[in-house]
Regions:
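Hydrophobic residues within alpha-helical transmembrane segments
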Residues: 6, 28-31, 50, 59, ...
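Transmembrane alpha-helix interface/packing and boundary motifs in multi-pass membrane proteins
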Residues: 13-20, 96-105, 136-148, 321-335, ...
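Hydrophobic alpha-helical transmembrane segments
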Residues: 1-7, 39-42, 83, 115-132, ...
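Re-entrant/interfacial helical elements at transmembrane boundaries that shape
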Residues: 73-75, 108-119, 132-133, 145-162, ...
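Hydrophobic transmembrane alpha-helices of multi-pass small-molecule transporters
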Residues: 1-67, 74, 172-302, 400-423
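Membrane-embedded alpha-helical segments and adjacent helix-loop junctions characteristic
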Residues: 42-129, 280-350
Length: 423
């Protein structure tokens, strides 16, 4: 177990230090995990989340068709016409991303909203880095709001046998949706404060962008609808969402070819698929698979349980804040999967309702990824988009938004859940 922890920690230090080489560092570390036997060859495919990888590939290609149609430019014009200055343009985009992310996967949300943000920044001639970071962290926050917003929410809903409406009203009380929205309200104020110096007025638009093709927009909206519908299908294949995104990209490419009559025109959307972002995620999945196989996550869960002792409030507090810390560095899906049965056992031993512990786990694990640029797939995707546009995201750029945003969101949720379900 110790070698796995050392390799994992060293890899993260290198990725934070040499941000331009993150994909190569992560892939190299993943290969080392395999070669040393810490991740057996037979477990490699199981460690890779093909659903996320296919979603990113499919949505990236589809979004390129969306961009080429000029629809993001038109949406940018609409947003710019409604807000007074750059500050509120950034806040409104983050809030809009959050609303979408409550029903659609976080990564897909970032890929869909980022083109609109980039277009606004081009028109305003301002740096898009904080805009995209704001969109990414807002997407991560709202993933816990509904049953369909994030994989961890689906896992928790399954463990507690919760319906879609149970996320709004549970055990005769307002449920976790309102904890998330309370955090969203305060974190929006944090974003407004972070962007407080961006008071430049929005210039009056002298012309309105003309959309060249509405089919990519229909396909993108269709993607959202199908992803929502798929979330209600019981026992569906793990790669369902990824296949939906890739299938709609295929439809878009076929339509594009039928429209232009040139196969070469199909290359643009395919070239837009960011292989470096996908490579980074592959490396991270292999690393996480390695530490999971070596028992690191199980040991971390056991330590949390021991640290909580027999006091429900102490246990709740430890679970929330340790989940924030752990999820800042490792994918929250294997962590949550490990902690769900641990919490069930603890609740049985203590003879208490496990609801506050489960809700604390979900809120902490979901928001923890916002603390670091590589703590969540949505963050990695957003940074990848910026890199392709020629922008470098320093760790400090992310920390100054991600960390205060996380604490502004988690503190009210922490208090809310305990007051309603712990006392």
């Amino acid at each position: 177990m110790i070698p796995a922890i050392i390799l994992f920690v060293v890899t993260y230090i290198l990725m934070l230090t040499f941000s331009k080489y993150r994909p190569y560092i992560a892939l190299a570390s993943g290969v080392i995990f395999i070669l040393t036997g810490m991740l057996p060859l037979g477990n490699v495919l199981g460690a890779l989340d093909f659903n996320v990888l296919l979603m990113i590939a499919g949505t990236m290609g589809l979004v390129q068709l969306f961009i080429d149609s000029k629809m993001p430019a038109l949406l940018a014009d609409g947003i710019m016409a409604k807000v007074p200055n750059v500050q509120w343009a950034a806040v409104c985009l983050a809030l809009f991303a959050g609303v979408i992310s409550a029903f659609v996967d976080n990564v897909a949300t970032v890929l869909m909203i980022a083109p609109v943000a980039l277009e606004i920044c081009r028109k305003l001639k301002t740096n898009p880095v904080p805009f995209i970071i704001g969109i990414a962290v807002s997407s991560n926050l709202q993933g816990a709001a509904t049953l369909v917003g994030d994989t961890t929410a689906i896992m928790l809903g399954s463990a507690l046998d919760m319906s879609f409406m149970d996320f709004f009203w549970y055990q005769g009380k307002p449920s976790i949706f309102f904890a998330v929205e309370l955090g969203a309200l305060l974190s929006a104020l944090i974003l407004a404060f972070i962007f407080r110096k961006e008071k430049s007025p929005i210039p009056t638009q002298t012309s309105v962008t003309k959309v060249t093709d509405y089919v990519p927009t229909v396909l993108l909206v269709g993607t959202i609808v199908l992803l929502i519908c798929a979330s209600f299908i019981p026992n569906k294949p793990d790669v369902t969402n990824g296949l939906i995104c890739c299938a709609l990209l295929a439809v878009g490419l076929i339509y594009h070819f039928a429209k232009t009559g040139e196969i070469a025109e199909m290359a643009g959307p395919l070239k837009s698929i960011d292989l470096e972002t996908i490579g980074l995620l592959v490396g991270l999945f292999l690393m996480i698979g390695g530490v999971s196989n070596m028992g690191v996550i199980d040991a971390a869960a056991a330590m949390l349980a021991k640290a909580g002792g027999g006091n429900l409030f102490v246990l709740y507090t430890v679970i929330v804040w340790a989940s924030v810390l752990i999820s800042a560095f490792i994918d929250n899906i294997p962590y949550v999967a490990t902690m769900i049965p641990v919490i069930a056992g603890l609740a049985t031993q203590l003879g208490v309702d496990p609801t506050p512990l489960y809700f604390g786990l979900l809120s902490g694990a979901t928001l923890g990824g916002n603390c670091t640029p590589i703590g969540a797939s949505a963050n990695i995707t957003g940074i990848g988009i910026l890199r392709r546009e020629g922008y470098t995201v320093r760790n400090a750029d992310f920390f100054k938004i991600g960390i205060p945003f996380t604490f502004a969101a988690i503190v009210p949720a922490y208090i809310y859940i305990w007051l309603l379900y712990g006392i």
